[in-house]
Amino acid sequence: LTPATLNSERFVVTGTGSSEAHARYLATLLNLHTDRAAAYLPLSGFVDAPATNFAAKTLVVFSQGVSPNAQIALQRGIDFEHTVLFSATTPEAAEEAGKPDRAQMLRNLESNRGELVEFPLAEEYTTLIRFVGPIAGYLAALQFVGQFSESRAPLPCVETLQPLLQSKAPNELRDAMCHLPSAFAGGFNLITAAPISDYSQNLACKFMEGLFWTCPGISDFLQFAHGPFQQMTAHPKPAVILQGDGRGEAEMVDRSVAMLRGVGASAYVIKVDAPPLLSIFGFEAALNDAVFAAMQHLSVDQVNWPGKGRDDLLYGFCPDQ
């Protein structure tokens, strides 16, 4: 990382789609595992915000392909002390993809002493859902924070990550999603512990993007008892529970399963034996497994997805310049 990045103390982090999860993950890492401070701000928050909101801060944008709307934030870079872009797109890749304006924007970023942090996979756009970029973005954020001198975040080795990336969904969950899709398609509950609940957006969105189902609601274990449980008791729906390696978490899982089964609701537990900053890799892999199995079984057309080419009024709110 450049000295300007390493010397940054306050960050404003943004991203949308699967990149929202990466941005929130980085904010968690910076706030809890370094002596620095970060705030997540959705892209629309950059449209009319006064420049004074951003003074003396570093802007961090996550966008796998530097989507048009990610450029809303990047165009506000002049109001920040420094800018960092996490992306799979390089000037060369953008040129090859026939996007010269985007290539020039990336060159301008670097010529103005901004920093481009690359992660795979460039041009992962044949299908609506993405599998490589979402996982790689978490790792890029973790490696980024690991370069700060006071970082307390773990830097995983290949031997640690490999078994997590081979995680599978329980057979009963795969079977239920394949053979009883109507039980899940209208939405279900995704229950997990903090801090995962703060950066689990892509775990939910993969069902919306991969299967075109209603995005499941995300609840922290203790939050689940404050409304979501009562609502699903009135209108039964399944719950998928994510369990890491914490002892307190194990008790919350047991209590959640007992509550759900007590009202006749289906509960499926995905267990990943890793701490929160690493278990996200296992949960991504396990839910990818479930989604991919259901996509195959239900013959979902991921190339000609619903609404393709009809979203530009908002997707292209900020055109390439």
What is each PLM-predicted segment?
Residues 261-321:
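Charge-biased C-terminal accessory regions appended to nucleic-acid-, cytoskeletal NTPase
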Residues 1-9, 113-235, 313-321:
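Active-site phosphate/pyrophosphate-binding segments
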Residues 34-38, 211, 215, 302:
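Secondary-structure boundary/capping signal
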Residues 225-228, 249-251, 276-281:
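Short active-site-adjacent structural elements
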Residues 6-158, 235-273:
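Glycine-rich phosphate-binding loops that contact phosphosugars or nucleotide phosphates
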Residues 28, 32, 205, 209, ...:
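Short, well-ordered alpha-helices that flank and scaffold nucleotide-derived cofactor binding pockets
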Residues 17-21, 25, 132-139, 194-198, ...:
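Conserved active-site and cofactor/substrate-binding residues in soluble primary-metabolism enzymes
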Residues 51-52, 97-98, 227-230, 281:
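Short secondary-structure transition/capping segments
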